[in-house]
Curated annotation (Swiss-Prot):
Ubiquitous; brain, spleen > heart, lung > kidney. Residues 558-652 form the PH domain. The keyword Ubl conjugation applies. Specifically phosphorylates the agonist-occupied form of the beta-adrenergic and closely related receptors. It comes from the Eukaryota. This is G protein-coupled receptor kinase 3.
Length: 688
């Protein structure tokens, strides 16, 4: 029976994988719903205050670029060929071989440069033209051939074109998407969890599918009780910090994190899913690798380490078991549980796996940095070639003996190794850090220029253009059976109680990596969500021709911010009512959707603006003269932050002005005034 359950778990998992690759959006069981366009008022202020409304910030975000491109190609009157030129250059940079680059570079030159030069309409500098012409004439078609144009294209788009984008519906849509992104609160209900694929000291790893996009991920779940029992809180939180550091910027050679969240019992990391098994497993199945095969893995691992080291992260646990393969055979470095940030203080703890730890790591109290990873790389490459670590001779398992040999033994390299390979390994396995390859100030660049990697195009490595030596079998999970992986004994943690102080440790644990979420959306449901939203907004615009548009009321007035909020209503203050609010310097107005009557609360009547909580939801509490309360709830986190800020500042400024005003202005008024729409329409530009 257990075997049947294991087979069914594998089949379900593999079917989910195949469907996710073909049509991930079709696998989405939840829908992303964009907020209404009126969100722009609040979101623009929110983003501006965080310096997020600039050309570079928007253009360099995936969703921002897609919307800007859509605006340039479909909504602006004047032609904007620069955007297509930019995309052509980006595609050119990904090309694999020189022949393809030569052909494409000439096409780009003829279409976007020569054609405009002949018509005397070329808007770019003479230096950019000469740079491309000079290199093309010598057939020097590197991936950076058009780099001067990238900079000038961005400069040409940064001015009036970007300003027009800011005034368009496409910028409104950008605000809608950013509101969704900044209001993500993940729970287990946002994922379909499949079979277990691994287990560690604190928890398990599962295959899972994200419900609203259909994308497949690995979910690493750490048990909070087990963490407490083993006093591993610092390690667990450190892994979250290290993953957040390395998961920004595109790196195809690290198992990166897209989300982190927690439940009352678990800490959850949502990571890149790797289906090809690990190098330790394949070493046992395939046998030792040739120099050529090892070189392939070395190049990709070097780029992964370079990405970490550029962010001042030392990995400290490099070994074949931590190198995972994807379905195509390319590799990623996984499990950053022992990684460490050395930007402010160098570590000196002895951590890692015996047989791969550098001498300076073994010498307690000795500070080290990225140097330790280059030594570990040497040990790992040796194992791929010989089947064992250079310091684990005769299959000894005595950790003290392995450490002693690491600190004292000179590694003898077999004669079958090529001179270039011997030179590489001798350089990496130097006990003296000052003599070690990668530790002379050039870091990864020292390895890239080593003779062993002569002829390697590192841009091709980055783009994963070299064919892997081993392709994992399709249609297999490439992981141990669920029953072989096993499970934790619940009795171990039966007596462990999680207290409020334990949960407080994890209050800042949740995280969304913006660029990775945007990429996930762009690859899956972006177009479908936009199309659905366009239909909904078109229907609402048609309906509002009779009723009047909520946002229109704020135009041409001194309205500070406007948008939907929930107001605690009815005589018993138990029911939330959705209303459209307008904040002016001296009052807060609101009305129901489609209603013509307007309600008003003056700043003069407000005693204080406070934050409160109702059923774990943050709310804005306005205390009103006479002991009454006015409670508002926002539909997203950014809205709450911005509305609370604007209401507080407006109230404080109104109080300052009232203290200076003549006393006769402070006549008693009712707290809330019901007004019909026509009198409001006849007010002056100050709203009075």
């Amino acid at each position: 029976m257990a075997d049947l359950e294991a087979v069914l778990a594998d089949v379900s998992y593999l079917m989910a994988m195949e469907k996710s690759k073909a049509t991930p959006a079709a696998r989405a069981s939840k829908k992303i719903v964009l907020p209404e366009p009126s969100i722009r008022s609040v979101m623009q202020k929110y983003l501006e205050e965080r310096h997020e409304i600039t050309f570079d910030k928007i253009f360099n975000q995936r969703i921002g670029f897609l919307l800007f491109k859509d605006f340039c190609l479909n909504e602006i009157n004047e032609a904007v060929p620069q955007v297509k030129f930019y995309e052509e250059i980006k595609e050119y940079e990904k090309l694999e071989n020189e022949e393809d680059r030569l052909c494409r570079s000439r096409q780009i030159y003829d279409t976007y440069i020569m054609k405009e030069l002949l018509s005397c309409s070329h808007p770019f500098s003479k230096q950019a033209v000469e740079h491309v012409q000079s290199h093309l004439s010598k057939k020097q078609v590197t991936s950076t051939l058009f780099q001067p144009y990238i900079e000038e294209i961005c400069e040409s788009l940064r001015g009036s074109i970007f300003q027009k984008f800011m005034e368009s519906d496409k910028f409104t849509r950008f605000c809608q998407w950013k509101n969704v992104e900044l209001n993500i609160h993940l729970t287990m209900n946002d994922f379909s969890v499949h079979r277990i694929i691994g287990r560690g000291g604190f928890g398990e790893v599962y295959g899972c599918r994200k419900a609203d996009t259909g994308k497949m991920y690995a979910m690493k779940c750490l048990d909070k009780k087990r963490i407490k029992m083993k006093q591993g809180e610092t390690l667990a939180l450190n892994e979250r910090i290290m993953l957040s550091l390395v998961s920004t910027g595109d790196c195809p050679f690290i198992v990166c994190m897209t989300y982190a969240f927690h439940t009352p019992d678990k800490l959850c990391f949502i990571l890149d899913l790797m289906n090809g098994g690990d190098l330790h497993y394949h070493l046992s199945q395939h046998g030792v690798f040739s120099e050529k095969e090892m070189r392939f893995y070395a190049t990709e691992i070097i780029l992964g380490l370079e990405h970490m080291h550029n962010r001042f992260v030392v990995y400290r646990d490099l070994k074949p078991a931590n190198i995972l393969l994807d379905e195509h055979g390319h590799v990623r470095i996984s499990d950053l549980g022992l990684a460490c940030d050395f930007s402010k203080k160098k570590p000196h703890a002895s951590v890692g796996t015996h047989g791969y730890m550098a001498p300076e790591v073994l010498q307690k109290g000795t500070a080290y940095d990225s140097s330790a990873d280059w030594f570990s790389l040497g040990c790992m490459l040796f194992k791929l070639l010989r089947g064992h670590s250079p310091f684990r001779q005769h299959k000894t398992k005595d950790k003290h003996e392995i450490d002693r040999m690491t600190l004292t033994m000179n590694v003898e390299l077999p004669d079958v190794f090529s001179p270039e390979l011997k030179s590489l390994l001798e350089g990496l396995l130097q006990r003296d850090v000052s003599k070690r390859l990668g530790c002379h100030g050039g870091s990864a660049q020292e390895l890239k220029t080593h003779d062993f990697f002569r002829g390697i195009d590192w841009q091709h490595v980055y783009l994963q253009k070299y064919p892997p030596p081993l392709i994992p079998p399709r249609g297999e999970v490439n992981a141990a059976d669920a029953f072989d992986i096993g499970s934790f004994d619940e009795e171990d943690t039966k007596g462990i109680k999680l207290l409020d102080c334990d949960q407080e440790l994890y209050k800042n644990f949740p995280l969304v990596i913006s660029e990775r979420w945007q990429q996930e959306v762009a690859e899956t449901v972006y177009e479908a969500v936009n199309a659905d939203t366009d239909k909904i907004e078109a229907r609402k615009r048609a309906k509002n021709k009779q009723l009047g548009h909520e946002e229109d009321y704020a135009l041409g007035r001194d309205c500070i911010v406007h948008g939907y909020m929930l107001k605690l209503g009815n005589p018993f203050l138990t029911q939330w009512q959705r209303r459209y609010f307008y904040l002016f310097p001296n009052r807060l107005e609101w009305r129901g959707e489609g209603e013509s009557r307007q309600s008003l609360l003056t700043m003069e009547q407000i005693v204080s603006v406070e934050e409160t909580q109702i059923k774990d939801k943050k709310c804005i509490l306005l205390r009103i003269k006479g002991g009454k309360q006015f409670v508002l709830q926002c539909e997203s986190d950014p809205e709450f932050v911005q509305w609370k800020k604007e209401l507080t500042e407006t109230f404080m400024e109104a109080q300052r002005l009232l203290r200076r005003a003549p006393k006769f202005l402070n006549k008693s008024r009712s707290a809330v005034v019901e007004l019909s729409k026509p009198p409001l329409c006849h007010r002056n530009s100050n709203g009075l």
